[in-house]
Amino acid sequence: MTKTGILKPKSVAETHQLMKVALGEEKADLTVVNAKVVNVYTGEILSDLGIAVKGKWIAYVGQKAGDSIGPQTEVIDAKGQTIIPGLIDGHTHIAWLFTPAEFLKYAICGGTTTVVTETLEPYFVCGYDGIIDFLESLRDQPIKFLATAPAMVSISRTAREMSLEILAKLLARDDILGLGESYWQVILQEPAQILPRFEQALAAGKTLEGHSAGAGDKKLAAYVAGGISSCHEPINAAQVLERLRMGLHIMVREGSIRRDLAEIAKIKDTGID
């Protein structure tokens, strides 16, 4: 089993250290003071807060972050600024148009700290080794890169040649979160070919990313029954609502390929939470 360590949880020692920083018994490596903080759990914007960081973990958010400041602590005065959680780009194709280095120039400036990319493109060109080389190129970057394994569900017949053995090797990696987008038409037309891949991914505790453009009502329901968890294809509020009612997580595209935000944003006027 191949592991990358990219999602390695806190150790007992790290957790104990964070507790000490939160209690003011140990000093932070970095403390941000005088900030407004967006709390995405409560929907509040809280004023005059501080954030204490130890290593790569946040230990404390509150009004007594000053207790964590020591002689070696880096202090940032964020007066007049607002801190939000880092943004996650949940679906993209890094290998399609640009290199990771070029992508980072723009992603970081927009507040993106984590990216989930498809890996279909390097597989077409170089197979399994191409995916591994691509994933290695995404390590040790200023932000976190995660990926999905090729679902091998495409309108192209040549794109359906990955064995279940290779898929299992990819799913064993902790930087592979699940299967990439799967076109609904192929799944409904060739369930015997595709559903074993879905079963394999779900058994590994991974997700199934969706591509449901053009599906609705019974066909959409049949697609969701396969275990699909998300979709980035809706282009208006009605399509978003239909998918939300079936339990899908929806991502909105706003970029060089599609600009759907204005239409989808109309859902806020429907009273839907």
Protein language model annotation of sequence segments:
Residues 81-103:
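Di-metal (Zn2+ and/or Mg2+/Mn2+) metal-binding site signature of metallo-dependent hydrolases
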Residues 30, 73-74, 81, 143, ...:
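A structural micro-motif
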